[in-house]
Amino acid sequence: MSAQSLPAATPPTLKPPRIIRPRPPSRHRAPHSPGPLHNGSSPKALPQISNDASASVCTSIFWEPPTASLKPPALLPPSVSRTSLDSQTSPDSPSSTPSPSPVSRRSISPEPAPCSPVPPPKPSGSSRTPLPSGPTPLQDGSASAPGTVRRLAGKFEWGAEGKAQSSDSLERCSQGSTEVNGEKETPEAALSGNGSQENGTPDAALACPPCCPCVCHVAKPGLELRWVPVGSSEDILRIPCRASPLRASRSRINPPVISHPPVVLTSYRSTAERKLLPPLKPPKPTKVRQDISTSEELPQPDLKLPSEDGIQTATKAWEGDRPEGAPLNAPPVALEGREEEGLDGLKGLQWELPLQDEPLYQTYRAAVLSEELWGVGEDGGPSPANPGEAPTFSRLPGPRNTLWQELPAVRGSGLLESLSPQERRMQESLFEVVTSEASYLRSLRLLTDTFVLSQALRDTLTPRDHHTLFSNVQRVQSVSERFLGTLLSRVRSSPHITDLCDVVHAHAVGPFFVYVDYVRNQQYQEETYSRLMDTNVRFSAELRRLQSLPKCERLPLPSFLLLPFQRITRLRMLLQNILSQTEEGSSRQENAQKALGAVSKIIERCSAEVGRMKQTEELIRLTQRLRFHKVKALPLVSWSRRLELQGELTELGCRRGGVLFTSRPRFTPLCLLLFSDLLLITQPKSGQRLQVLDYAHRSLVQAQQVPDPSGPPTFRLSLLSNHQGRPTHRLLQAASLSDMQRWLGAFPTPGPLPCSPDTIYEDCECSQELCSEPSTPSKTEGQSLESKAPRKHLHKNPEGWLKGLPGAFPAQLVCEVTGEHERRKHLRQHQKLLEAVGPSSGTPDTPQP
């Protein structure tokens, strides 16, 4: 290899250029078809290049593009015409000659970066042509208007010509790879992306010039090359760079480029600068919220509410600051520029459109409790000092439900000035029923969508646990949706709400009974949730993940499970507030009383069902502790049975000895369990177990105090018929006098009252009567009797009237059902006879302690 083919020596501090060995041509080019040269220069001029080029910093590389890669003359830009290229073949180029970046052997990137429209060099044995090194003139010989690149706020802008050139360079970049020694080679600028990219958009105007192996274009770690077009920037129109290489279609022919301004290397820039620049994001539409104090005079749109089948509410004005330059009397931006089709589409949406800003019901309930704690009025603000003065509604910090006075239709109709303060408070109370139901429904939907319908959470539970944990909450949600839709259809009729209590009453006597079924399982819900959190690790982990979602606002799952019972109780409080503000004798008062009575019945039934379920759970736990040893087992769990009294007593007995020893007292600890219809006598054992000693029906148990002023309180407990059908007696000692009085009061002696000849029966011993003759309400004081209908009486007077469940009826119209009740009655009569005769009748004496 001759010394002339080697590049010039470089200083030690600079990286030497890469030596590319030319490859001999595969065949000799025919003299008659030399092929078009890229720059139009003659091959004879090539040997005249002196060796003075070795003294320069940049070493020229001569190349000739293959015939297949050349475009037709019609597709070549005018800036690269033969005339313009011939003018740049002089080897004495200025120092501002474009210096391409070095080449590399890396593979082509799937996302082509912008690169120079000039093809890269290809070493071959054919005639070599130097790269263009001067400004590119136009076809008419005039200098082209150079493009300009500006960096403003993290984005690049350039002229109209530069934009067209960048789009053309994107297509040529994909074809700019060269073959060196049989391998595919891609320019460094196309791979490393010397043009900086901000926010995912490449700077097409900052594309590198044609590649060259000179040391001034060597890429440095952590730095990138900065390229700036030569020329003035005053005549260039600035257009933001939004071009992306992925959007450039290869099948689409780019428009011809008028000119290609030369670029020069100015400096290196650290790649850390990109991280310091904020990303460019499209501006978000500003939500305009109207101030309450200044929006009273603003014209507001009409109230837009759905029909009965929809669940859409009134249009709610945005709250917040106005954008700069917006007039005070301008409508909200959200309604500006909307066509009629857009408004019709909004009417078809559900209630989230107007009430989407309503807080969750947990937040609403906390705000209500805070207002009640700090003395804030029920209408949303403190009561005015002067009763005739209009109340001012001050909002507590944090999310809060919408007030009636904030509705655009209310402000536009002038109702705030025409209504009295009392009527305004009534409107706020009525509208709170709607907004609170919207918040409640939003929380229910969040519970259903996030927890109930979560497949990941369902996979951690068994079907039984999943049903017990969530019960029929989806049915409760559907009832709430229908209820809210009916309320909104009433509010839609007029901004001035006439009444809503009739709607509440219609739903309370029908669909609201689904709350009873849900609240009944509340005890099982709490136990299942506690058990799963302690034993099921997968469930607890998935539940914590769901609760941490932003839409859940870090609220726990139990707060969602308690929503139905909290809502029905809050609805009763709202009805009480409405009833207190109604006028005497008005239709509002009548409807409020009916609605309040219906909702109160549901709450009472819910409370009764909750208590009954707790009692059933208590019976189940108690059954697990009982041990029937030498006693016939008894099924204890029953829907009608409940535990009324439980306590520990001490039985006094005598221990009989031999001939040399006399009898001495014996103390045995007992535990008595008194149910609604049964008495169990048990003895405590280890491990909280209870061994059953005896049991009897409650109506066959009697208790009598033993007079002993010096000793502890003692009473005698008699079972007229125990589990074996025999009478037994026990002498029991209580820990205190109050405990003894409790047990004595639990077994009252049946008979007439001291001041009345009527007979009072206990619930456990009342008889059942069967109607033998139907009667009309005139004969039965308002209670009708049907044939063969059973009745239960608790009170019997000498006139022959029986008062019980459900009312009073004459005794001659019914006949007592014989059976177990008759047998127990005869046993009691026999016991009274034995007590009247005395100890000689065979009743054992009670041993004295």
UniProtKB/Swiss-Prot annotation:
It is found in: Cell projection, Dendrite. Keywords: Cell projection, GTPase activation, Guanine-nucleotide releasing factor, Phosphoprotein, Ubl conjugation. Residues 1-146, 159-202, 277-308, 771-803, 819-849 are annotated as: Disordered. The keyword Ubl conjugation applies. Residues 111-123 have a biased composition (Pro residues). The modification Phosphoserine is found at residues 107, 109. InterPro entries: DBL_dom_sf, DH_dom, Ephexin-like, PH-like_dom_sf, PH_ephexin. It comes from the Eukaryota. Residues 18-31 have a biased composition (Basic residues). The keyword Transmembrane does not apply. GO terms for molecular function: GTPase activator activity; guanyl-nucleotide exchange factor activity. Phosphorylated on tyrosine residues upon EFNA1 stimulation. EPHB2-dependent phosphorylation at Tyr-361 triggers UBE3A-mediated ubiquitination. Interacts with EPHA4. Interacts with EPHB2. This is Rho guanine nucleotide exchange factor 15.
